[in-house]
Regions:
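Generic short beta-strand segments
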Residues: 62, 132-135, 167-168
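Short secondary-structure boundary motifs at beta->alpha junctions and helix caps
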Residues: 81-89, 156-193, 197
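Generic C-terminal helix-cap and adjacent flexible tail
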Residues: 7-8, 197-203
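A structural "domain/chain start" motif
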Residues: 26-95, 124, 202-203
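Surface-exposed short loop/turn segments
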Residues: 27-48, 53, 104, 108-159, ...
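Extracytoplasmic/secreted envelope proteins and their assembly/folding machinery
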Residues: 95, 99, 103, 109, ...
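Sec-dependent bacterial lipoprotein signal peptides
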Residues: 1-26
Length: 203
């Protein structure tokens, strides 16, 4: 349900309702069965590459700390505070979802000779390391924010070839339920697309 930007009373009411549905950090929803689960999508539309794919890439397991390394959907009700939605969760640990959807994004872009995860039968030229810094709904201002630090490492040398921090913020029409997840998915899609395009110019 969308909250109009000019309706400040309705917007405040929506925020207050959403805050009532939050649980602190790592608390667990009690009763009523498991909450509905949500997934992330992989970007599909990319500009045509200017050269033929030449590198093979392994995307390592993404890393994160605290509640981000779980299936909880994070909300930031105020600066310095985090909570988790009580009425929703990711279909898997967020770190796993990010790795899988990042691989799919690279496959969709067709900018690598091959891309996979550790254990796949790929003779990798490079590894991509992803560290999730933020992946949350920000209550103040109603927005979704995703920040991921990416590093490209030479598979044989073990040296960092390049590194960059990617951030996307998009408006959210609500702080919980499908509208909040849609905003997070859009922000993630922007970051994932930027990572793919950046990596394809570096290697």
């Amino acid at each position: 349900m969308r909250v109009s930007s000019h309706n400040s009373g309705g917007k405040r009411a929506a925020v207050l309702l959403a805050l009532a549905l939050l649980v602190p950090g790592c608390s667990v929803l009690s009763g009523g069965g498991p909450p509905p689960t949500f997934d992330l999508s992989a970007p599909e539309q990319f500009p045509r590459a200017s050269r033929a794919p030449r590198a093979q890439l392994i995307v390592q397991d993404a890393t994160a700390v605290g509640v981000l390394d779980s299936d909880k959907i994070v909300v930031r009700p105020a600066e310095g505070k985090i909570a988790a939605l009580a009425d929703a969760q990711w279909s898997e640990r967020l770190t796993r979802l990010v790795q899988v959807r990042a691989i799919q994004a690279f496959e969709n872009a067709k900018r690598m000779r091959a891309v996979g995860r550790p254990g796949d039968r790929i003779v990798a030229d490079y590894q991509l390391l992803l560290d999730i810094r933020s992946f949350e709904i920000v209550v103040e201002g109603l927005s979704a924010e995703v920040t991921i630090a990416a590093k490209i490492v030479g598979d044989r040398s073990g040296r960092i070839v390049a590194g960059r921090v990617f951030t996307a913020r998009v408006p959210a029409s609500a702080t919980q339920g499908p509208p909040a997840i849609a905003a997070l998915d859009e922000a993630w899609g922007k970051v994932a697309s930027d990572i793919v395009l950046w990596a394809s110019t570096v290697i």
